[in-house]
Amino acid sequence: MKKYLFKPNSPIQDAFDRIIVMADGAHAFGAMRNGKKCGSVADFTNFSFHAVKNMTTAEGGAVTWRNHKGIDNEALYKQYMLLSLHGQTKDAFAKNHGTSWEYDVVDTQYKCNMPDVLGALGLAQLSRYDEILDKRHKMIDMYNEAFKDMNLQVLNHHDENSRSSGHLYFVRFLGKGAEFRNKFYHKMAENGVMCNVHFKPLPMLTAYKIKGFDITDYPNAYNMHKNQLTLPMNSKMSFDDAQYVIDTFKKVYAELTAEEN
């Protein structure tokens, strides 16, 4: 490698003396591999606490970073605070609990600070997140055991070296197409079980179609999408609820495959 090929454009990159590794941990809060949790591996990791996530603050998220020689953690934290509140040096709490009301706006930045009420919601969930995650994985085990002899493909959520965040439980109907999946979805809904599909490939969305993208150019994406279904799994469900999902799933599967034959 040529000397001086890497040219840092900020004091932070200069301290790292290399390209910074930033991870998208939006759905991965609590995931672990080889004893290391998501958020402790990359230099920076961004998490989402949107309403559909395992742990939610209704909206918002968090960023974590690893200790690194030459990085002042307190200064970096303050920089994030400036970025999220218009570049303002004091928030409302600090203005009313200090020795002076005086504040400054040192740069034109964003308005994306988390409201205190939502932060309190997150702290309450954080205190019991291990319990929430354990429950999700017990439901995953229930689903896995129930579907192991069926012609389905499921995502592996845990083994001896890793454990996912258990965010979604989805199945693929092997040898089936979109028509079967869509019928299955409606049959489950008729029995009181709301499923979902994750996710629709971008070339199938109008915003991308008008830019010239065509799903026929992405056969792998379509083949993964066409027969995929996501089953209910959340911390408010009971194990009896999960068993009802299983029983309904098997009943609907038997009905639809019988119709095909």
What are these regions (language model features)?
Residues S40-A42, H50, T56-E59, S164-G166, ...:
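Short, solvent-exposed loop/turn segments at the edges of secondary structure
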Residues N46-F47, M55-T56, G61-T64, C112, ...:
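Short glycine- and hydrophobic/aromatic-rich loop-to-beta-strand nucleating segment
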Residues G25-A28, G60, V117:
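Generic detector of well-ordered alpha-helical packing
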Residues K2-M55, W101-V105:
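Conserved active-site segment immediately N-terminal to the catalytic lysine
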